[in-house]
Amino acid sequence: MGLHRDEATAMETLFRVSLRLLPVSAAVTCRSIRFPVSRPGSSHLLNRKLYNLPTSSSSSLSTKAGWLLGLGEKKKKVDLPEIVASGDPVLHEKAREVDPGEIGSERIQKIIDDMIKVMRLAPGVGLAAPQIGVPLRIIVLEDTKEYISYAPKEEILAQERRHFDLMVMVNPVLKERSNKKALFFEGCLSVDGFRAAVERYLEVVVTGYDRQGKRIEVNASGWQARILQHECDHLDGNLYVDKMVPRTFRTVDNLDLPLAEGCPKLGPQ
């Protein structure tokens, strides 16, 4: 993302980011800025050919993926894998671990590079390899100062949201560090047009490998912890809708409607 944008472009980016993993209020604030965000694509099996992965899969050859564009018609066409849409088995099956000795290989490094580009182009704050049709345990995430600057201060405080640099994790293993939880609305690049409230742990620790193959450990809290849980869920074949609070699922257009009677309130639980 460029550092210099006119107001319309900045508002568009805010609208898209807010609908990925931000609470309702930010999404409602920017609803008036609308741009097309999807167009038909091809099967995730085409993505797998980019990385010399086996194309035999339980996925239907007719399964279509959704390609999310970050800036509408202003985006130039680039040669990147498509984001796979919900319903494709690659999103609902457990991903395979990467051999640590292969992390530095050209194939794995290309997968990581493409994941970063796709995440930023969307734009989103996280992406898992299965979302580009690659059934491997790799995630990428980042939350920039620019993204956070668009959110209201009270929202940032409620989320315990702090910026962090690009993070790449291979074979991540996540564990909660406390029983404290919070409830906020989530979205997903693979489930376009819908949102639901999901309860997540506020503090987690994640171990794994970085893109150089070195062992790393990340202690995360607040919004970063939520993003990590969301992306690690993808590696086990789970989407946020598999963990959503019942009766909170809704379209983006209905984000401003009140929660159904009996639903828990948003925020720390």
From Swiss-Prot:
Keywords: Chloroplast, Hydrolase, Metal-binding, Mitochondrion, Plastid, Protein biosynthesis, Transit peptide, Zinc. The keyword Chloroplast applies. Its cofactor is Zn(2+). It is found in: Plastid, Chloroplast stroma; Mitochondrion. Residues 1-60 form a transit peptide. InterPro entries: Peptide_deformylase (IPR023635), Peptide_deformylase_sf (IPR036821). Pfam families: Pep_deformylase. The keyword Zinc applies. Its EC number is 3.5.1.88. GO terms for molecular function: metal ion binding; peptide deformylase activity. Coiled coil: none annotated. Removes the formyl group from the N-terminal Met of newly synthesized proteins. This is Peptide deformylase 1A, chloroplastic/mitochondrial. It comes from Arabidopsis thaliana.
